[in-house]
């Protein structure tokens, strides 16, 4: 057993509400001891026990690694021209997904693996240590299974999303596609996934179709999540609560009844601020959700069409500026909130026995993540207690 002491931490975010140190449980002049990839101790630097090795944080802020609970990384092709068209006034429509479906079906395994690996590494450099990844750009039995197998190379949090949109070959017979998803596709894909997701939205899947798909996934041992209420008011949030989904994602257009349902449930509302940023859509009112008692997570929603970024610090800044979260709330949502959205208790916070996933910031406080938007503040990232990325300055 080897131990690592990280000391001289200027500001340590623990997300431990029992410390009587604000909602983030912030400790000053702190230290952390890691043993065999897990948190073994944390507290004041002056009380830190000895360890085999030492990392001097040099006054930096240290936070739990970000937990990204919503990502679409298995794809091929480029939709930058679609983005440019939106910036020229063309409204966003979910149908653009079909463009990526064609490119993904035509791509080699090597191409898909290269893209996923590159984007996961990009997310890691911005502090993300836990990452969910969905299928959804194959939309045949064979292609969806391939996408899940590619996703499994970078994460255990693999989501089957054959119900992303109805593929072109089923445009006239969408119920036949739903039947395929509920039977042969899930039979083949469920063993390769942990979660089942559905885009419950106009232009995608209606309430009855979405419910049937989620129930078919649940019957095969998958846990549900829902893309809900992104493009307009709809039944997605209520369906998510009905199915005890881990999360309802987007939640841009929600009613008082939707918010009350979320607040009284175990379903997390995952906000995806980069999607609104990239589509010029109205932002959901995060303040309204939090004040009502809804548990909120943040995610970049990395995908090639409506939000092509993996950068959680950017999302924190946008959530503070446009969704009216405080910096503390946004950092909590990007760490502990994401863990709640994945129903994980071993990441997103510091506790003895939790996974030692940490990000060191070139800043004295986590507030700088919102205060200095666009600045690459992540100086080092630890996953399972090992430094997996760092700038030269951290150890020089």
From Swiss-Prot:
Q: Does the keyword Metal-binding apply?
A: yes
The record's section on Pfam families has: Amidohydro_1
Q: Where does Fe(3+) bind?
A: 70, 72, 227, 301
Keyword terms = Cytoplasm, Histidine metabolism, Hydrolase, Iron, Metal-binding, Zinc
Which subcellular locations apply to this protein?
Cytoplasm
Q: Which InterPro entries does the entry mention?
A: Amidohydro-rel, HutI, Metal-dep_hydrolase_composite, Metal_Hydrolase
Known cofactor(s) = Zn(2+); Fe(3+)
Q: Name one GO cellular component term.
A: cytoplasm
**What GO MF annotations does this protein's record show?**
imidazolonepropionase activity; iron ion binding; zinc ion binding
Q: Which domain of life is it from?
A: Bacteria
Catalyses which reaction(s): 4-imidazolone-5-propanoate + H2O = N-formimidoyl-L-glutamate
**Where does the chain bind Zn(2+)?**
70, 72, 227, 301
Q: How is the cofactor bound?
A: Binds 1 zinc or iron ion per subunit.
Enzyme Commission number, as recorded: 3.5.2.7
The biological processes this protein is annotated with in GO are: L-histidine catabolic process to glutamate and formamide; L-histidine catabolic process to glutamate and formate
Binding sites annotated in the UniProt record for 4-imidazolone-5-propanoate: 79, 137, 164, 230, 306
Q: What function does the entry list?
A: Catalyzes the hydrolytic cleavage of the carbon-nitrogen bond in imidazolone-5-propanoate to yield N-formimidoyl-L-glutamate. It is the third step in the universal histidine degradation pathway.
Name the UniProt record assigns to this protein: Imidazolonepropionase
Annotated source species: Mycolicibacterium smegmatis (strain ATCC 700084 / mc(2)155)
Biological classification of the source: Bacteria, Bacillati, Actinomycetota, Actinomycetes, Mycobacteriales
């Amino acid at each position: 057993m080897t131990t690592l002491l990280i000391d001289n931490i200027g500001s340590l975010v623990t997300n431990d509400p029992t410390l009587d140190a604000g909602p983030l449980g912030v400790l000053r002049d702190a230290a952390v001891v890691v043993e065999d990839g897990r948190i073994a101790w944390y507290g004041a630097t002056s009380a830190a026990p000895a360890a085999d090795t030492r990392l001097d944080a040099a006054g930096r802020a240290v936070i739990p690694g970000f937990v990204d609970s919503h990502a679409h990384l298995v794809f091929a092709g480029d939709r930058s021209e679609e983005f440019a068209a939106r910036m020229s006034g063309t409204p966003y429509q979910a149908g653009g997904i079909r463009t990526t479906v064609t490119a993904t079906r035509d791509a080699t395994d090597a191409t898909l693996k290269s893209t996923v690996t590159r984007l996961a590494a990009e997310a890691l450099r911005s502090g993300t240590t836990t990452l969910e990844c969905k299928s959804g750009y194959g939309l045949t039995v064979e292609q969806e299974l391939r996408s899940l197998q590619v996703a499994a190379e970078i994460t255990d949090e693999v989501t089957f999303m054959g119900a992303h949109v109805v593929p072109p070959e089923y445009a006239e017979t969408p119920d036949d596609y739903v039947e395929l998803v509920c039977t042969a596709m899930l039979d083949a894909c469920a063993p390769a996934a942990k979660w089942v997701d559905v885009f419950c939205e106009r232009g995608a899947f209606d309430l009855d179709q979405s419910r049937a798909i989620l129930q078919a996934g649940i019957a095969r041992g998958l846990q549900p999540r829902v893309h809900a209420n992104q493009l307009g008011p709809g039944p997605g949030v209520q369906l998510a609560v009905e199915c005890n989904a881990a999360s309802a994602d987007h939640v841009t257009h929600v009613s008082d009844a939707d918010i009350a349902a979320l607040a009284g449930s175990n379903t997390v509302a995952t906000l995806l601020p980069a999607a609104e940023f990239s589509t010029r859509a109205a932002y959901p009112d995060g303040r309204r959700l939090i004040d009502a008692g809804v548990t909120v997570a943040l995610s970049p929603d990395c995908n090639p069409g409506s939000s092509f970024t993996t950068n959680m610090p950017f999302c924190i800044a946008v959530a503070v500026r446009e969704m009216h979260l405080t910096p503390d709330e946004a950092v909590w949502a990007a760490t502990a909130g994401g863990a709640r959205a994945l129903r994980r208790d071993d990441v997103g916070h510091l506790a003895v026995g939790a996974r030692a996933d940490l990000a060191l910031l070139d800043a004295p406080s986590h507030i700088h993540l919102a205060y200095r938007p666009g600045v690459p503040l992540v100086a080092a990232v630890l996953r399972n207690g090992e430094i997996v990325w760092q700038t030269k300055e951290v150890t020089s």
